[in-house]
């Protein structure tokens, strides 16, 4: 969201944040974090070579309309700077903030969609949904109004999988995870759906995640020991996002 509260204070953007020539397109922004999450979850500790393991198949982008009042509220600037004139239509600033892309990694099909609104919903913030389909189950991370905008992990069993066998394997897996995360538990929500329950007090916040990432980055800078898979996966990540931007621009012509 363009205008939101971070650490209890309104987030004020610089005016140039709305210029995609300076800030970059949305399809190459939040998408980088989503690609990291996908790689960590689906290809843990695997090296991804962008030249041989990645194929970007399709990408598109579209604009979020921002009024002058909204722009001024979020930047504390009273008027649109001249460099934004090319994005203004009927007195409304059109920011190419949204995008979707489809690609494959090691033959696995992946789709990402990012949508920017001006403000988050009431009592909500930046929201996230993830769906991973497997042969035995589908993993869903849901964060919506129904759940009070709290991220929850659900496992949906495939209909042709035996209930008793599935539950036994799921419980065994959870018990293995409990060695490291003893607070984890699984709840049967019926109709083949299971909730992996993580107590709120055990969840790290947004700022805490940034702290962990910063410490890891500074460690790599100081010790010059970034793992090879991390190096290659970083190249692959930015290959995907930059290729997606190029594809989306060509599609709009």
Report the location of each language-model feature.
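Predominantly a Rossmann-like dinucleotide-binding segment in NAD(P)-dependent oxidoreductases
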Residues: 1-90, 217
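C-terminal helical cap and adjacent loop that interface with cofactors, partners, or active-site loops
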Residues: 23-30, 34-51, 96-111, 118-253
